């Protein structure tokens, strides 16, 4: 089997159908499979996933990294495409993924494929494009170089209130999404789990994912509340516990000014203003909650 699409879910009925529909051509006719690991959804997520041909596994929540690694462990394809439930494969990326799974047989095929992959790098050594071309030429065998290609970074178009946010650090937001099975692992973090390619080299694809992240302000405020609590735990773990004017007021203000003005967030209109304003509030919440946690610990220990 060529490809396994893996997704973790919890109450994603508003998103999962769109996501699965976008990858159907990649897995049709036995070319691949869809693995969904659900953590006890109470809506129609599981029903929708099964109706789209996904293999659904229901497991207790173990944390983002552990849950995603569990989904990867269930994959049987040579390649794994790891998606969030609110991500959609755009047509251009779909074409590129289809192309990448074709096996080159001649030098011309190899060169054509190379032109479809931009800024190939070693994740560890950041090897230059020129060096990689020399490697390809030295190896001679058209298949040998791409045998070492173990992962691809994919850009994400983050949507906020329906608008693609192109500035302020939100684009291109590249993530390692496609990798050979057995060559990547998610590393556990309280906030924003990270995936690491453990061997081989990685490239960047030209196509992108649509990330339907925050369709409403309520969604973003809920996200801010959850992630500021997790971020506060990280702050406490680092020992930055003091309630200070810098952390509660100046740091959020600097965050807003930097992202909105210096990183051109103002070019994203009203949506950009709201996003960066609320992101600054998130920073303030994070440090305020860290102070609250430290105060609670001091109360319990006294």
Language model feature labels by segment:
Residues 2-4, 33:
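Cell-envelope/extracellular polymer assembly enzymes that use nucleotide-activated donors
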Residues 80:
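Short aromatic/hydrophobic "clamp" motif used to bind/position activated sugar donors
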Residues 7, 12-26:
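Short, well-formed alpha-helical segments that are part of the catalytic scaffolds
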Residues 30, 51-53, 76, 198:
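Short, structured coil segments at secondary-structure junctions
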Residues 22, 34-47, 84:
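A conserved acidic beta->alpha catalytic loop
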Residues 72, 91-294:
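Catalytic-site signature of metal-activated, phosphate-bearing donor transferases
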Residues 44, 65, 83-100:
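Acidic donor-binding/catalytic loop of UDP-sugar-dependent glycosyltransferases
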Residues 59-75:
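Glycine-rich, basic loop-to-helix element that forms the pyrophosphate-binding segment
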């Amino acid at each position: 089997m060529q490809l396994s699409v893996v997704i973790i879910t919890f109450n994603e009925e508003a998103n999962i159908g769109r996501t699965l529909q976008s990858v159907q051509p990649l897995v049709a006719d036995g070319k691949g499979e869809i693995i969904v690991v659900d953590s006890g959804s109470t809506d129609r997520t599981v029903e929708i996933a099964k109706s789209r041909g996904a293999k659904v596994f229901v497991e207790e929540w173990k944390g983002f990294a552990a849950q995603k690694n569990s989904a990867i462990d269930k994959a049987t394809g040579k390649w794994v495409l790891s998606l969030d439930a609110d991500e959609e494969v755009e047509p251009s990326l779909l074409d590129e993924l289809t192309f990448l799974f074709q096996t080159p047989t001649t030098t011309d095929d190899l060169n054509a494929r190379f032109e479809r992959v931009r800024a190939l790098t070693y994740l560890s050594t950041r090897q230059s494009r020129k060096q990689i071309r020399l490697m390809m030429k030295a190896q001679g065998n058209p298949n040998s170089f791409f045998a070492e290609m173990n992962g691809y970074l994919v850009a994400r178009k983050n949507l906020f209130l329906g608008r693609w946010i192109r500035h302020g650090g939100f684009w291109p937001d590249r993530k390692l999404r496609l990798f050979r099975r057995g060559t990547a692992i998610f590393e556990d973090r309280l906030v924003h789990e990270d995936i690491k390619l453990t061997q081989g080299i990685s490239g960047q694809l030209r196509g992108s994912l649509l990330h339907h992240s925050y369709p409403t302000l309520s969604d973003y405020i809920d996200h801010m509340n959850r992630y500021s609590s997790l971020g506060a735990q990280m702050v406490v773990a680092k020992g930055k516990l003091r309630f200070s004017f810098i952390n509660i007021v100046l740091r959020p203000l600097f965050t807003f000014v930097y992202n909105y003005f210096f990183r051109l967030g103002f070019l994203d209109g009203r949506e950009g203003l709201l996003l960066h304003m609320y992101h600054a509030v998130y920073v303030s919440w994070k440090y305020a909650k860290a102070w609250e946690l430290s105060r609670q610990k001091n109360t319990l220990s006294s």
